[in-house]
Amino acid sequence: MFASYLLLVLWIIRLVPTTHAHTGNDAEYLLNTVLKRDATSLSRNAYLDSEATSGATNYCSDCDNDEVIVTVDGTSTIWTILLDSTISTLVTTTSTEKTTLTSCGQSCTKSKDASSVSSSSASSSTSRSLIFRTSTKTVTDTTTLPTVTEINTFTTTDSHIVLVYTDINSESTITGDYTFIKNKNTRTVIITDYVTSTVGGETQIVTQTTTSVVYELVVTCPDHDFATTLTGSETFVPPTTAPKPVETPSPEPSTTILSIKSESSVPSATTSVLDTSITLETSSSSIEFSTSTQESSSIGPSSSSSIGSCTSSSISTEESLSTTKLSSSFTSISSWEELSSSFTQSTTSSNAEPSSSFAESFTTESLSSTIEATSSMEDISNNSVLTSSIFSETTTNESSSYTDEPSSSEEITNTYEPSSSTESSTTDQFSSLLSSSLPVTSTSSTTISSATPITTVLSTSITSQDTNCEATITNISTNTLIETITVNGNTTIYTETQLSTYLTSNTSINCPNTNSATTTTTQVIPTATTEQIHTTTLNGSIIVSTETATLKTTVIITHCPECTNESSTSEYSSSLKAESSQQSIPTIESNLSELSVSSTLSLVESTASGKCSGLTTTTFTSIVSTTTESIYTITSNESTFEMTTTVTNIGTIVITTCPTITPVSSSYSSSESLSSSVSTSLLTESNSTISQSTVSTDKSSLTNDNQISTVSTETPLTSITIIETTSKTTESLYTTTSNDSTHIFTTTIIDVQTNTIVTCPTTTSTLTSSHTSDNEKPASLSSSSLIESDHIADGTTTSTTFQSTSTTTVDHHCSSCSEILLSTSSSIIGNKSTSTSISSIETSASSSYHSSEPEVMSSSSSTSIKQSSDSIPSTSQTHVSTTSSSVSSLETTTTTTENSPTSNGFSSSSIVTSVNVPDYVSSSVSSTSSTTSSPSTESSSNGLVSTVTESSTANENTSEITTIDNTSITSEKVTGTNSNPKTSEIIKDATITTSGNVESLHSTTPISSTSIISTNAISSSDTTTLTITNTLTYSIDSITTMKTSSITTAPPPPQQKESSSVLSSSLIINSSTPTIIPTINIPITFEGNANSLGLKNGDNSWIIGIMMIGLLMI
């Protein structure tokens, strides 16, 4: 649209009449008259067929101070068929135009007749990506004046040839917890236009050949799924029901050809029809499209069903006639090139020498993700491009991306997240999991009395990882323009070459996470200037064009606060509580900003009677205002042409989510002998690091050698219904100023979408824990196994009605950064419906721990998620962690069935299947550090011990070796010596002792606890780190247990905007080799009754005392 509008402006400028007086040559005056056009048109374009209908067009001309009215009626029909090995391409263009011009002042008539020429071309090439489009149009214009009759003939031949499209298979690189996928695409497009004009016996032939070679390399970080904490009995709901933004496809540019992957051969006796698919993202997983071929006269059924009482099944059957449908979509498109040129000729029929005027406009428009201000343009022949950035997390993670380009250049992106605290504690992952996320507190049924009721809280926490992964996109395009103009036998050849390289980085933006009523986020992207120098052989002149774009985005998010149930312990029942966690990120694009809102639904079972009645309505209202200012300047010789375009897009998105949760009864049984459980609540600020470790010690006064606890929970059917309505209004205001003229027009797009999602999960969980101790030898053995099977039937119905859609989206969700969808597609007026169903989800996890004289640790986890849906992939992931090796594998299979019937009779259907199996990757990380400290000084004051330590030197060496297909990649980082950093450390200790007895119906149990609080403050020149460590030793009936909790608070570095609360787990294996466990953002919530811990009269003063002392010290 922008290119065509630019051509119209240039055409108007060229046709500005001169100031000479009106002579008797009426033909010259008529040709140089400014025509004001007021037209309305309705068009529909697709690869299958194309129809264009133009309504009445009125031309108003000042012909001797009288009105001149010109009426034009025309229709145009184009058919295009993809070329195959035995099929030819037939392009037919039919145009009928009739022009009648009546002058009031003198006898002046003008008529225009058009004749169409049909041409066909055939080729014997077997390349499926070879397309010929040829059309010839001849228009004859006859003008009759009182003195002369002039006949003008225009013949235009358009030849559109797509020669080569190469799609190289994707490459995957797995480094630790991240997976990078590289897609390489190369395409060559040749467009040849022949324009023959005959005006008054003078013939002019203009030939233009445009060759575009685009090489694209896209590096993305795909799905990381989400981090899940399993507590033993929970209702597992993956975040697939989150509100999603409405993605509106954009019309395809004239020189952009969708990818055609030659994965299977098409029978030579069938016809291949190229379909254009409309992509709407409905899940939180990345989707890759490829080509699937369906044989002729075959029936492809697709059915899916679920298991459980609440069953939702859908069976769809597709029948194809004697044609093979070939549908493809280029999912990794991040930019598209639009080449356009305009020719304006003005020729007089006088007796003077024939003159010709030629005006050229060459526009290259690129739509991609935002250009980071710190991105650097590097030549392809350089060896490496290194980009560093610091993120807001406080743990140390190493990730690297290796890019292998055909020109033997390396691009390595290292992301280093500094840690401002040092943790040297040994953490038992399984014990920490039980103590922090499994507050199951119960005693034998014989000890239950009315004064000390039992409270059972089984919770599930599903939190998405914010990995701050970036998608780096490198585009290299080469354009060659060859023009040949022949005027009366004189031939002039113009040659223009252009080489453009774009390096863009999709920068992660922190998501607002708050419960306030209104959140306003303003993002101002720095001005991105792209200067392209075109070297043109045109009589020695040089054309220099400069484009400047400025983007400013304002996002306003409005949502209602969370509704919380009030707990009651009067009766032993169960209910469900729904909590919503909203995270949003504005993704800046060239013309319109999309708002991604993800919602995580957690189900918590408690003995409660809520005020919400199981109904919570959440409304998101986002207003995205994007203003783009483009300044286009062309300097040639002494002339300068400057055009300023201002585009303001105001998009309003209203998402209303109304989940209805039907609670059901649940059964809970516990059989145990002499057990104790403790639940601890830690309250931290948003910039804190929580580290927990649990150490169990046994005394010789143990009465039982074996302790076995079994918890079995079976949750019946739970129905969840979510009605989601999305309303999107986009208003675009275009303002173009060229020289002295200004043009303004506005477009408005309204899109309403309603989704109804019904989820019926059934969960069966079994948790078995055993503990064996020996009185003579300090050895312990604990094991746990969790087997959970969820059957979920998820039916999604999407109905979309839209009048006009024109957008290119780059979707980068903030919650997991896993979903980076870069797509460009076209759509038509009509309706669309999509159905989604999920069959089952299975999850299993196991962990074992064995402790003796030498400390050895091993853990294994297995996660299997099986799903069958339209747009959700099946994921199977296994992670085994031993002493120094890790193996990760990922397999994704996606099947999409889509039907899009329209009111105009045009329909497109696609069956897409994609299988992505990354390469085997092994990675090893070794890190060594050494620190030298000066002697410490101690002083005692009021019972508190203060220690001051001054550090002198610190060295750190980190080496990482990654093996991909027997190819090793070594990344080594060495931190130099710090001389005299002047770091002071202050340690203060305090001890609290509590003792008492617990009386039950039959016995009296003594209990005592000792709490030692250590405060460590480390101050440097710019930051201060405060660490509070609480060591709690409690004894119940001569069984002693020691628990250590540590809270570290540190201000964020100056580069960070905000910090987050993270739960960090680390393991020390053989006291030398670390095993890195991913850091997950988990909000800690304490729910339970202190009486169930065995404390008499609800004496939880030790918990309150610890937290109060910690807060006072902070």
From Swiss-Prot:
Its main location: membrane. The keyword Protein biosynthesis does not apply. GO terms for cellular component: plasma membrane; side of membrane. One of its GO terms (biological process) is cell adhesion. It is found in: Cell membrane. Putative adhesin which may be involved in cell adhesion and virulence. Involved in the regulation of filamentous growth. Residues 232-256, 284-314, 392-430, 764-784, 844-963 are annotated as: Disordered. The keyword Translocase does not apply. Disruption phenotype: Affects filamentous growth. It is a lipid-anchor; GPI-anchor. Residues 844-910, 922-941 have a biased composition (Low complexity). A lipid is attached at residue 1089 (GPI-anchor amidated asparagine). Residues 942-963 have a biased composition (Polar residues). Residues 240-252 have a biased composition (Pro residues). This is Filamentous growth regulator 23. Keywords: Cell adhesion, Cell membrane, Glycoprotein, GPI-anchor, Lipoprotein, Membrane, Signal. Induction: Induced in biofilms and by alpha factor. Repressed by HAP43. Residues 1-21 form the signal peptide. Glycans are attached at residues 382, 397, 475, 490, 506, 539, 565, 591, 637, 687, 739, 831, 957, 966, 1070. It comes from the Eukaryota. Residues 1090-1114 form a propeptide.
